[in-house]
UniProtKB/Swiss-Prot annotation:
<dbReference type="InterPro" id="IPR027417">
    <property type="entry name" value="P-loop_NTPase"/>
</dbReference>
<keyword id="KW-0547">Nucleotide-binding</keyword>
<comment type="similarity">
    <text>Belongs to the helicase family. AddB/RexB type 1 subfamily.</text>
</comment>
<feature type="binding site">
    <location>
        <position position="805"/>
    </location>
    <ligand>
        <name>[4Fe-4S] cluster</name>
    </ligand>
</feature>
<keyword id="KW-0234">DNA repair</keyword>
<keyword id="KW-0411">Iron-sulfur</keyword>
<dbReference type="GO" id="GO:0005524">
    <property type="term" value="F:ATP binding"/>
</dbReference>
<keyword id="KW-0540">Nuclease</keyword>
<dbReference type="InterPro" id="IPR014017">
    <property type="entry name" value="DNA_helicase_UvrD-like_C"/>
</dbReference>
<feature type="binding site">
    <location>
        <position position="1138"/>
    </location>
    <ligand>
        <name>[4Fe-4S] cluster</name>
    </ligand>
</feature>
<dbReference type="InterPro" id="IPR049035">
    <property type="entry name" value="ADDB_N"/>
</dbReference>
<feature type="domain" description="UvrD-like helicase C-terminal">
    <location>
        <begin position="281"/>
        <end position="587"/>
    </location>
</feature>
<dbReference type="InterPro" id="IPR011604">
    <property type="entry name" value="PDDEXK-like_dom_sf"/>
</dbReference>
<keyword id="KW-0479">Metal-binding</keyword>
<feature type="binding site">
    <location>
        <position position="1129"/>
    </location>
    <ligand>
        <name>[4Fe-4S] cluster</name>
    </ligand>
</feature>
<comment type="subunit">
    <text>Heterodimer of AddA and AddB.</text>
</comment>
<dbReference type="GO" id="GO:0003690">
    <property type="term" value="F:double-stranded DNA binding"/>
</dbReference>
Length: 1171
């Protein structure tokens, strides 16, 4: 029994010495005693390859490469102990979830924390850490007693409570495992116990290579190996000079020196002979003097400069994607020009979550074979999502999101259907469910679902059409496709008494859906498309899910569990599933995490993402215990994993390992922006390297090749897939500025695409975009007539929409596009309810020959309740009756109608104007409808402007009859003459024109009428702020002011007083007008003369004629207006259709100048020739 150390700096040949010794021993004595070669898990494959890579050693039974966990399996199979069921990480998380749920009421700190994402991952890691550091539940309990007895501050009490919770959960976890199961850490503990019994290990020659430190648990394994083995050789990365000095935590080799001393101490305790340490002083790894210099002087202060030709490249990139593309181009160059193999190259990084997806895509595009040494979660696979969402459907009462997450896995589809057809049908089915608010009991009820193409209050009495009946049948068929397997599962789960029976139900659910066959189809399809990685995913996921169900049954099979807990435990297990990495092929670029990688035999290393806070890593408090709490526990005798401070001290060693992996070339790069464009800073580590290599110039990587030299641009010509985008860049440049003579090689590249049989058709679609202009071509007269008909019949809002943006008008009224109908109460619905409610009250008053002024407060309240109750069942598929939230909203709406009724009552008392009619139609046909506003357009097409007027009021005096328009709005609104001039606000003046023009035909006495004005009435229930103790009368007066109607009224004092008979001087509380003492109007009055009203009405006609002419002539320009901070695009539903983009030459806003009303009025006069 002896111990031997092989030490040396990085690249000194420690592993090579050990491997050569083993190979020589195998060559001399192939059947001798066992040789164990122990390495970290991630080194096993490459070490195995290196061991048998010699010409003299092509295979061996005597020498085996193990990690600690694999050695545990080997020993337990030999001496016993492997019969207990292994539970993996998913099983651990499931068991912990069950324990936490059952312990929840007794937990102090973790009761609420258990609901947070990642809690069980952190808890599992904490328990694993306890085990690795030989901390038992009783140790934790004793620590809690100690902390609880001496905790005085809030922080101390929090730690005591946290430790209490941990010991409870840890103890329960260990009790659940004892005698039945083993987790990964238990195998190592069993290995410690069983090693003395192993004949396989007894007397073996043991090599331990690639480690920098050992946990207490691993150190105990090393102890037993030294006792059992003939000789143990351990390699450590240490400079021999360091051993001659006192240990200092700032030393580069501090961690490995501590490990050296700990192992020597163990050897002394066990009376193991310690052989003479073998120090390796040479640097055989480095073929580059620059890299040898970097290794030898890495920790030197001040930095030792290297003035020769350096094989170190430092780059900054415009963004993360540009950085990865730069790496890909350089890799291709190394392989093509320097005769590198892909396996000679490694890419190291730390923040893989930001890079891996981009690297998979780009390396595939550049035809670079690669292996990403990182396990991917299975959580996004359709099978995992199908199980999780199906259980959520059942436990969560059939919520919409859970149902359609399950649908979109496509595993509910029948096996024999055409996927594309079913996908399209399900999209329409989802639209139906959204529009009708389908969830909960409606899914499980046997009542058939109904389909009607209506939404407004006016469309509720229509008969069902054939198309509606056909759609209804399809919807009910699709409903059964979705619900039948889930309801069957739901019924079985209700009958299931134990976890085993529940797991059987899940298995039956998958089998009856033919999931294995569907996964096989997905696998075949992936293989046919050349995506072999995803092909194996479909195989793995089924095996892992079956294994998870088996583990669940083994652990908790006979226990009874509620459906909600079963769902939570199953979801926790599914979240922990990961795809196993397929071992790399013989020739691939290795992409690995800096912290976990153990590389050997690479010629070139690319270290990417070297940004501040990433390399070196910024301090982060993660996990169950903070740094301060770990230090408290450490001081009390419980050793745990290093704190953030200790980790930061070790960071220099990590970076040293990182830069000393390659033998010939080192590339260091960082992006200046992430994928979202957020600025990133280069790491201080880059500055250190620059100081060591002052001759190295910092290069810049960009995806814009225009500013690069010819030789640099040529490097961007790579595979056809990636080069096409750069050809497009150059052609765009040529299109604008012309090519420079020395860049004409891009024409050669272009000619490749247009002449290649393989790429001609593919590239034509891309290259055609070079001449793409985002302009809407004018419609022909024939197409325009097909779309809009021989008679254009449109509302005023349609005309206004055309003036806001002609393309939006085309999308809505030409193509009949509309947003997906969703079961929610929108502003139009609320507006519709307000209009209907006020009309019903007004109609009732007309029938009873009463006016608003006749109502009492109590009657206002009674009527508001009555009409809302009557309307609610008819609005938006009974949305106001669909939930408690909507019922509350119904009450709020009723209060608004009540308040509005009170205000209308007050207005009626103060006004000589009385309502003539409400919801007055024009151009609608039928009795009571006024004629439309008609136009004969120059091209022979007729146009009718139609609509419905909220309210028309009439007043009479000795000067005649006056009519005014009241428009109910659910938001504050005023009439802006600038918007009238630009055709953006035509509604009120159109209504006024319609009623005054048709007054003689419409009014009962057949008399003519003059315009009195147009006013907006804001329907709301305002909150007012009052100072001091205000009386109820004062509050009501202030509320009345909040209902002041804005708009434009006739500049006649008598007419204004008819609108507010309480007005003598000052401002009116009812309308936006006021009188001075001399009888003239105040400056803030919104007034117009009768002549000006006539001009405005003429201008409205003029504007409609222009709009009609443009519509019929096929104008569909993508030209939205912009005026100040208002723009047509702000609330437009068609932005994704028109693709309006200000960066394009053809896409610019029509900028409209904001004007004063007087200036706008003057321009309106000029247009129509008014005086």
């Amino acid at each position: 029994m002896s111990l031997r150390f092989v030490i040396g700096r990085a690249g000194s040949g420690k592993s090579t010495l050990c491997l050569r010794e083993v190979q020589e021993e195998l060559k001399q004595r192939p059947r001798g005693k066992t040789i164990l070669y122990l390495v970290p898990e991630q080194m096993t494959f490459q070490t195995q390859q290196a061991l048998i890579g010699s010409e003299d050693v092509r295979g061996s039974i005597r020498a085996q490469v193990f990690s600690f966990s694999r050695l545990a399996w080997k020993v337990l199979q030999e001496v016993g102990g492997a019969s207990r069921l292994h539970i993996d990480e998913a099983g651990v998380h499931m068991l912990l979830r069950k324990i936490v749920e059952s312990r929840k009421d007794g937990l102090s700190v973790f009761q609420k924390a258990a609901e947070q994402n990642g809690f069980f991952e952190h808890l599992g890691s904490m328990i694993a850490e306890f085990k690795r550091y030989n901390v038992t539940p009783s140790n934790v309990y004793e620590m809690w007693q100690q902390l609880d007895a001496h905790s005085s501050s809030a922080e101390q009490k929090l730690l005591a409570n946290k430790v209490y919770d941990l010991q409870l959960l840890y103890d329960d976890f260990e009790r659940a495992l004892i005698g039945k199961y083993l987790d990964s850490e238990d195998y190592l503990q069993l290995l410690v116990e069983k090693l003395p019994q192993s004949e396989y290990v007894n007397g073996a020659e043991i090599y331990i290579d690639g480690f920098h430190s050992f946990s207490p648990q691993e150190l105990e394994i090393v102890r037993q190996l030294m006792i059992c083995g003939a000789r143990v050789t351990i390699t450590l990365t240490i400079d021999e000079k360091t051993l001659a000095q006192p240990v200092n935590e700032l030393d580069l080799f501090y961690e490995t020196t501590l490990t050296y001393e700990k192992i020597k101490q163990v050897a002394r305790e066990e009376k193991i002979e310690i052989e003479k340490t073998i120090p390796l002083m040479e640097q055989p790894r480095f073929h580059s003097p620059a890299l040898a210099h970097l290794e030898a002087h890495y920790e030197a202060r001040p930095n030792e400069k290297f003035n020769g030709q350096a094989s170190v490249t430092i780059s900054t990139a415009a963004n993360l994607r540009a950085e990865v593309e730069g790496v890909a181009r350089e890799i291709r160059k190394l392989v093509a020009n320097e005769k590198y193999r892909y396996r000679d190259i490694a890419v190291l990084l730390r923040n893989g979550e930001s890079y891996y997806d981009v690297m998979r895509t780009l390396f595939t595009d550049y035809n670079i074979p690669h292996f990403i040494d990182e396990k991917r979660p299975m959580s996004h696979h359709p099978l995992v999502e199908c199980i999780r969402s199906a259980l959520e459907i059942i436990s969560g009462n059939w919520r919409y999101d859970a149902v359609f997450r399950c649908v979109k896995t496509e595993l509910l589809y029948p096996l024999d259907v055409r996927k594309e057809t079913m996908r399209e049908e399900m999209d329409k089915f989802e639209n139906y469910c959204l529009a009708y608010g389908v969830q909960g009991k409606r899914w499980t009820s046997e009542d058939p679902w109904m389909y009607r193409r209506y939404r407004s209050l006016d469309d509720t009495n229509g008969m069902i059409t054939d198309s509606e009946r056909e759609m209804e049948e399809k919807i009910n068929r699709l409903r059964d496709v979705v619900r039948t397997p889930v309801i069957r599962m739901q019924k079985r789960l209700k009958r299931a008494g134990t976890v085993m029976q529940m797991c059987e139900v899940v298995y039956l659910f998958l089998e009856e859906l033919d999931v294995p066959k569907k996964l096989e189809e997905l696998r075949i399809r992936a293989e046919e498309s050349g995506d072999f990685l995803f092909a194996t995913d479909h195989e793995q996921v089924w095996e892992e899910v079956m294994s998870l169900l088996d583990t669940f049954v083994e652990m908790l099979g006979e226990e009874k569990m509620s459906l909600s807990m079963f769902t939570d435990v199953m979801s926790t297990g599914l979240e922990a599933l990961q795809f196993a990495n397929i071992p790399p092929s013989l020739d691939q670029v290795l992409i690995a995490n800096i912290d976990h990688s153990r590389l050997s035999d690479v010629k070139a290393t690319f270290i990417i993402g070297v940004n501040e806070g990433v390399i070196p890593a910024a301090p982060m408090d993660e996990g169950m215990l903070s740094d301060e709490e770990r230090e408290v526990l450490g001081a009390a005798g419980i050793e745990l994993a290093p704190t953030t401070r200790q980790t930061l001290l070790e960071e220099q060693f990590v970076m040293y390992q990182m830069v000393t992996r390659a033998s010939e070339r080192l590339y260091i790069s960082c992006p200046l922006a992430d994928e979202e464009g957020k600025t990133l800073l280069a790491s201080s580590f880059i500055k250190k390297i620059k100081r060591m290599f002052p001759n190295v110039k910092d290069s810049f990587i960009t995806n814009d090749v225009n500013d690069l030299s010819r030789s640099e641009q040529i490097s961007y010509v790579a595979t056809p897939e990636v080069t096409l985008s750069y050809v497009m860049q150059q052609l765009q440049t040529w299109k604008r500025y012309g090519f420079e003579g020395n860049l004409d090689f891009w024409w050669d590249v272009y000619n490749f695409y247009v002449t290649s049989d393989e790429w001609k058709q593919k590239s034509s679609r891309v290259l055609s975009s070079l001449f793409y202009r985002n302009r809407a071509k004018k419609l022909s007269t024939a197409v325009s007539r097909d779309l809009y008909g021989d008679i254009i019949k449109g509302s005023v809002s349609r005309m206004e929409l055309f003036n806001r943006c002609a393309y939006a008008h085309f999308a809505q009224h030409g193509l009949s596009l509309r947003e997906r109908d969703i079961f929610k109460l929108d502003a139009p619905d609320i507006g519709e309810l307000f209009h209907a409610a006020l009309k019903k009250i007004a109609d009732k008053l007309l029938r009873e020959n009463r006016t608003w002024s006749d109502l009492s407060i109590k009657e206002c309240e009674h009527l508001s309740v009555l009409v809302i109750e009557e309307i609610a069942p008819l609005l938006q598929r009974q949305i106001l009756l669909s939930s408690n939230r909507h019922f509350y909203l119904k009450q709020k709406l009723q209060q608004i109608i009540f308040r509005t009724s009170i205000i209308l009552r007050e207005h009626a008392k103060s006004s000589g104007f009385v309502p003539v009619d409400l919801e007055v139609p024009f151009g609608m046909g039928g009795t009571g409808s006024l004629p439309p506003m008609e136009f004969s357009l120059p091209n022979g097409v007729k146009m009718e402007v139609v609509g419905r007027i909220d309210r028309v009021d009439k007043a009479e005096d000795e000067n005649g009859t006056f009519l005014r328009i009241i428009d109910y709005k659910s938001s504050s609104k005023a009439l802006d003459l600038t918007e009238v001039y630009y055709g953006l606000a035509l509604q009120m003046l159109t209504y006024l024109d319609v009623v005054t023009s048709n007054a003689q035909m419409w009014m009962k006495k057949g008399q003519a009428a003059s315009p009195a004005g147009v006013l907006y009435f804001h329907i709301h229930n305002p909150i007012v702020e009052m100072k001091g103790d205000a009386s109820e009368a004062e509050i009501e007066k202030e509320i009345l002011k909040k209902f002041k109607m804005k708009g434009l009224v006739l500049g006649d004092a008598d007419v204004v007083r008819l609108m507010d008979n309480k007005l003598s001087t000052g401002s009116s509380d009812i309308i936006s007008a006021g009188l001075k003492k001399d009888g003239s109007f105040s400056a803030r009055s919104s007034i117009a003369s009768e002549q000006e009203f006539n001009v405005l009405q003429k201008y409205v006609h003029h504007t409609f004629e222009n709009i009609g002419k443009d519509i019929t002539e096929g104008v569909i320009d993508i030209a939205p207006y912009k005026m100040g901070n208002k723009a047509a695009c702000t609330f437009c539903n068609f932005k994704s259709v028109c693709q309006f983009d200000e960066s394009l030459e053809d896409n610019q806003f029509r900028t409209l100048k904001d004007m004063k009303d007087s200036e706008a009025m003057e321009k309106i006069r000029e247009e129509v020739g008014g005086e």
